[in-house]
Amino acid sequence: MKKKQTMEGVVHGVFLFLGLITVGCVLLITVYLIVSGLPAISKIGLGKFLFGSEWASTAAEAKFGILPFILTSVYGTCGAILIGVPVGFLTAVFLSKMVPKKLRTVMESAVSLLAGIPSVVYGLVGMLVLVPGIRKLFHVPDGASLLAAIIVLAIMILPSIIKVSVTALEAVPPEYEDASLALGATKEETWFRVSVPAARSGIAAAVVLGVGRALGEAMAVIMVSGNAPNMPSLFESVRFLTTAVASEMSYSSGLQRQALFSIALVLYLFILLINAALNYFLKRNALG
């Protein structure tokens, strides 16, 4: 009996230690970003930094306004979500409820392959195929634009949304569907009015993963967006928060480097706010 209790205590201690490591890593990253990012904000001014419309970090009279980056990231992420979530969600319903077994194996393999493709490959294909296509189709001077970035991001978030949504839908107890069918509902009504609402927390988690992937992507975006610090427009070259950091960090110094850490802090806070909002709405729905 004592040996069993000792073993349980050891296992509990190991899991506690591993959990503390995870929490500690998050705290270290948070503290580091705050310590590194706040000096630039205090020097530039919070209002000028967040709402300034011009970024010229290497000019003689440097300007550090990141409003174009914030708006571009918001528009780009929202655009990717508007495209990626419906496609990913409906694909997940098809995979979990409708698809024949042989076809499901093929589709799941394709989704897994899509998830494993490196970001630079997405960017390369987008740069060689999508960007010229947009230029020819819409008769614009340069296809490297916000639209190209939205399309690439929408494709990149599909695997996360599909996989997590499929897992959530398959976790719904079969008794729910059996009861619905017994009451005379069709299969389609059962899937969308019973199974989907029951799996809404998992589907919401899939959406958050997609948002996080879209907000945090840099390599593919920098290859198809043009990476110009303009105010966002669908057919103009733009720069995201992530690409601003990635494109300038290698040669930055002084206030410019501090400002890049401030951008990273803003991006980090965006992710925290999105997660907090999701948890709030899920808890409210559960209570309601």
Task: Please give the residue ranges for each predicted region.
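Generic hydrophobic transmembrane alpha-helix motif, especially the helices
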Residues: S112-A154
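Cytoplasmic-entry segments and transmembrane alpha-helices of multi-pass inner-membrane transporters
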Residues: H12, V87-G126, G288
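Interhelical loop and adjacent transmembrane-helix boundary motif
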Residues: V221-L267
